[in-house]
Swiss-Prot record:
Major location (coarse): plastid
Gene: ycf4
The organism of origin for this protein: Cuscuta exaltata
Example of a GO cellular component annotation carried by this entry: plastid thylakoid membrane
Keyword Plastid annotated: yes
Signal peptide (from-to): none
Protein name: Photosystem I assembly protein Ycf4
Length: 184
């Protein structure tokens, strides 16, 4: 989503609160909880999951391995849920031609650097750059090339924009900022 006027362009960036992340976190939680309950059931000798026969799983070695995988999955699931609740990666890109500044803001993980805020002058922007990676995991990422600093990504690597969409976005941004486009 974006908002644009003659002198200001604000591009809102979606973070980790996506349907796919919610689905993966939910599936991983249920699967790892199931593994942990089966491993615990085999250790206790009681059936904690009614639709699964206990006699088929002995504690050593299957119960131990299932408990380990269940605990590992619960840790990964809790990491995903925390990332979703903190909305890591969300923020905005603000391009202000009137004041001659560019502000990039992103939410990070809790701590000292939770708020990531970058500010540049428009005159320091060398170009808008498109990087294309071909192969099985093909991707296109839009970067802003800043003098004296490394390139700053403006799109997510998992955004999967078509070549036409990334070209249109790069052309509009380059026209708005009055800088050239580079393709790598």
């Amino acid at each position: 989503m974006s908002w644009r006027s003659e002198h200001i362009w604000i591009e809102l960036i979606a973070g980790s609160r996506k349907i796919s992340n919610l689905c993966w976190a939910f599936i991983l939680f249920l699967g790892s909880l199931g593994f942990f309950l089966v491993g615990t059931s085999s250790y206790l000798g009681r059936n904690l999951i009614s639709f699964f026969p206990l006699q088929q799983i002995i504690f050593f070695p299957q119960g131990i391995v299932m408990s380990f995988y269940g605990i590992a999955g619960l840790f990964i699931s809790s990491y995903l849920w925390c990332t979703i609740s903190w909305n890591v990666g969300s923020g905005y890109d603000l391009f202000n031609r009137k004041e001659g500044i560019v502000c990039i803001f992103r939410w990070g993980f809790p701590g000292i650097n939770r708020r990531i805020f970058l500010r540049f002058l428009l005159k320091d922007i060398r170009s808008v750059r498109i990087e294309v990676e071909e192969g099985i995991y093909a991707g296109r990422v839009l970067y802003m090339d800043i003098r004296g600093q490394r390139a700053i990504p403006l799109t997510r690597t998992d955004e999967n924009l078509t070549p036409g969409e990334i070209e249109k976005k790069a052309a509009e941004l380059a026209y708005f900022l009055r800088v050239p486009i580079e393709v790598f």
